[in-house]
Amino acid sequence: MVWDWHLLALGVVTGILSGLLGIGGGVVMVPVLVGLGFSRHQSNAISLATILLVALAGLVGFAVSDAVDFPVGLVMGAGGVVGATVGAKWAYKLSGVALARVFGLLLLVVGIRMLWGGETTGSVSIDVPWSLLLAMGIGVGVGVLSGLTGVGGGVVMVPAMVFLLGMGQHLAEGTSLLAILFTAGAGTRVNLGNRLVQWQPVLLLALTGVVAAGIAALYAQQIPADTLARTFAVWLLLVAGRTLWKARPSEAKPSENR
C-alpha cells in the first residue's frame, strides 16, 4: 500500500514516545492515521491494538530499570478495564466529529497541565484503602477516555500518578505502561467485536514501534523528565488546536457522522 512506509515511520515515533514518556502513543497515531485516510473509528481501533504491543515492549525496558510499581499499575489497570470497555462501546455510537472533539479536548487539557508542570502532592501509600480507591478511580476514568479516543491513557495516567499519588516522573511512566496494557486490551476486545481492527496497519506499526519502545525505555531515565514532558506538551497543544479547528461546526461533513 502507498502508506506502508508512513506506518513504519509512525511506529518508530510512537515507540520512542512510549518508551521515553510512558504513554501508549495514541495521541500521535490517531491524528496521523486519520490523515492517511482511515476513519476516526478505524484509527481509534488500530491505535489501541498497536498500543497493546508497543506498551508491552516499553514496560519490559522500565521493569529492567526497576521503574515499575506493580501494585499500583495492577489496581489502576483493573479500573481501566471497566472504563475502557464502557468507553469503546460509547465510541461506536458516537459520530466521527464528536470523537474528534473529545480527543481534541483531552489533548488540550493534558497539554496545558504538562506544560504548567508543578510539584507532586507528596507520597501516598497504595496500602491505604482510600488510595487504593483513588488509583482504581483514576483507572476507570482513564479507561473511559481510552476507549473513546483510541489513546492508551498514559497522557492522563502519568500526570495523575505524579500529582495525585506523589510518584516520581520515571516511576509513573513505567507504571503507566503496565496499566495501559489493561486499558488497551479491554478497548481492543470491544473493537474486535465491532470489526473495527485492521491487522495489517497494526502489524506494520508494531514492527518498528516495539523495537523503538524497548530501546527508548532503556535510555528514558538518562534524560531530564521536565524537558521531555514540556516539549511533548507543546506538541499536544498544537495537535489539540488542529483537531478542534477541523472539528468545528463549519468544517463538519456529513460523511464524518460515522
Regions found by a protein language model. Give the residues of each.
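N-terminal signal-anchor/start-transfer transmembrane helix
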Residues: 8-19, 27-28, 186
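Proline-centered helix-kink/hinge sites
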Residues: 30-31, 53, 158-159, 182, ...
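Acidic (E/D-rich), amphipathic helical modules within compact regulatory domains
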Residues: 23, 30, 35, 40-42, ...
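Transmembrane helix boundary and interhelical junction motifs in multipass membrane proteins
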Residues: 21-30, 148-160
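Short hydrophobic/aromatic, small-residue-rich stretches within specific transmembrane helices
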Residues: 47-51, 73, 77, 176-180, ...
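Membrane-embedded alpha-helical segments of transport systems
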Residues: 49-57, 178-185, 211-212
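Juxtamembrane transmembrane-helix boundary motif
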Residues: 1-14, 34-36, 40-42, 60-148, ...
